[in-house]
């Protein structure tokens, strides 16, 4: 076994799990990155994957691999950067043990991440939320479950992975009703529930008690719902909701859109960004600042506060009479 293979085994069996205590999702992502990289190098260098050592993991080869991911596999710049992070993590850990490869590793570590475009956050209006919540069939158990699931997510703003991992023990519907979850970076947080959400969950839990298992939102036989299952159920209800709310047709709505909607509702209610960051489980307010850019009402209010005293509030509207406008010009 060559030094690269040994370093990979040491990283994933000892360093990642024991010393860094990385999450299972992070370990899986890093593992998949190295599987892709080794397969790519084996194909391009025409050598067996087992024969690839540190001398093949050069900056030019890694850069070409990242380009391959983006241009041939169709990965986004964000995914490309995540793959680069995985490569860097393993090489950074290996460099002290293999100083003979320090020059090669240092050049790889110097590869810069690709700049990404942060799109404006998409969220649902109150009318669109109403249409989505009205879509599940209330005459079936799955319809009533889906209604509870969607209403719960819109209010709490939990990530889809957090919703999937919730158990019955995470719910407290007594005085000061809350939901406890473990989010990214295994940061634990407790989110308060509104009276309306408590009522919805209490009704759902009465029916949920007849099914086995501990998952909060489960299938008919008690099995936990997967991320794909949640997205599938939402897509099904969106097709129904769109017929009653045409604005949904031009939006790409996912479970994460419901999270964005919860954040925008808090922002519209005047909640401080730092509090919203805590609510969503963000490590800092940098990620939460994106919601400020998405809310046009905040920008309009800023314009109105800075307008001259003799100018009425609102945005500019051109004079529909073009001849009058030209005369006054």
Q: Which residues does each PLM region occupy?
A:
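Conserved catalytic core of the tyrosine transesterase superfamily
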Residues: 1-329
């Amino acid at each position: 076994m060559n030094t690269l293979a040994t370093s990979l085994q040491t990283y994933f069996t000892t360093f990642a799990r024991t010393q860094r205590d990385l999450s299972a999702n992070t370990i899986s992502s890093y593992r998949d990155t190295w599987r892709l990289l080794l397969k790519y190098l084996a194909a391009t260098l025409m050598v067996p994957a087992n024969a690839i050592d540190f001398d093949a993991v050069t900056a030019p080869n890694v850069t070409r691999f990242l380009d391959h991911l983006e241009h041939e596999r169709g990965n986004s710049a964000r995914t490309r950067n995540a793959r680069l992070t995985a490569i860097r993590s393993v090489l950074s850990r290996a460099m002290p043990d293999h100083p003979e490869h320090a020059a090669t590793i240092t050049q790889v570590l110097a590869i810069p991440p690709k700049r990404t475009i942060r799109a404006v956050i998409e969220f649902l209006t109150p009318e669109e939320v109403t249409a989505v919540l009205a879509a599940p069939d209330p005459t079936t158990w799955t319809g009533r479950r889906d209604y509870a699931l969607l209403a719960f997510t819109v209010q709490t703003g939990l990530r889809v992975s957090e919703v999937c991992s919730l158990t019955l023990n995470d719910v407290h519907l007594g005085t000061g009703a809350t939901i406890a979850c473990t989010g990214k970076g295994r940061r634990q947080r407790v989110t308060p529930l509104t009276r309306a959400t408590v009522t919805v969950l209490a009704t759902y839990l009465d029916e949920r008690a007849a099914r086995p298992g501990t998952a909060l939102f489960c299938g008919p036989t008690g099995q936990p719902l997967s991320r794909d299952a949640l997205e599938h159920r939402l897509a099904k209800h969106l097709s129904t909701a769109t017929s009653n709310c045409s604005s949904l047709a031009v939006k790409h709505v996912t479970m994460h859109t419901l999270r964005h909607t919860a954040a925008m509702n808090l922002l519209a209610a005047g909640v401080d960004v730092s509090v919203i960051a805590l609510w969503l489980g963000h490590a800092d307010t940098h990620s939460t600042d994106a919601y400020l850019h998405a809310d046009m009402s905040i920008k309009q209010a800023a314009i109105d506060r800075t307008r001259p005293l003799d100018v009425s509030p609102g945005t500019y509207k051109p004079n529909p009479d073009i001849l009058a406008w030209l005369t006054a010009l």
